[in-house]
C-alpha cells in the first residue's frame, strides 16, 4: 500500500502512479499457470519422460491397492460386506456351513473353486477369498494354542519326572554314603579285633614261657630246701646209690673178664656162624 507524501518529488509520483495494476496482472498470470505443466522441449528431459510416466502409473496402482484394501477391511470375518455408512451384511447360516465344509476339504482356495463357491452361494469371489483368509488365520491360531497346550503338558510331565529322578538320585547317594561309612566302620572293627588278638597271643606266649620256666625254678628250689631239711638221709641215699652203681660196675667188669678169657682159650673159628647152605645139605642127608 502506497501513501501519498507531498514532500516527494513529482517524478517519483509519476513512476509509482500505477504499480498495483501491473502486480495484479502478474498474479493472475501466475495463478493460471499453476494448473498447467511447463512446456519444455523433449530433448531437455533426456529420457525422463518414461520415468515420469512410470511414476504416475505406480502412484495409480498404489491408489487402487489402497482402495482395494479399504474394501477388504470393510469385510468382516464372516464375509459380511460393509460400505461406508451402511450396516454389515452378514452371511446366512447355510453359506457359512458350506464355506466351513469347503474349508475342511482344503484350506487353500484355488481360483476355480473360489468362482464355483461364489456362484453356488451367491457371493462375490472377493468375499470367498477374504473368508478363507480369515478362517486360515483363526485355524492357525487355534493350532498354535493346541500345540502350546500339548507342549506345556509335556513340559510339566518332564519337569515332574526330572524332580522324581533327582529325588531318587539323592536317595541313592545317601545309600552309597551309608554303605561306605558302614564298610569303614566294619574295617575299623576288624582291624581293632585283629590288633587285640595279636596282643592277646603275644601275652599268652609270654605267660607260657614264664609258666614253663617257673616249674624248673620251683623244682630246684624244692630240692635245695629238701637237702637243707634232711641232709643225712639224702647223703645216705646218695651213698647207697653210689655203692649200688659200683657193684653193678664190678659185675659188668667180671663178666667182661669171663668173656675175654673164653675168647683167649677158644679158637676163632669155633664162634663162626655155620653156613646156611651147609645146614641145608646136612638136613637133606638126614
From Swiss-Prot:
PROSITE patterns associated with the record: HOMEOBOX_1, HOMEOBOX_2
Residue runs in coiled coils: none
Any Pfam family matching the protein: HALZ
Any single GO BP term: response to auxin
CDD domains the UniProt entry points to: homeodomain
Location(s), subcellular: Nucleus
Role this protein plays: Probable transcription factor.
Name listed for the protein in its UniProt record: Homeobox-leucine zipper protein ATHB-20
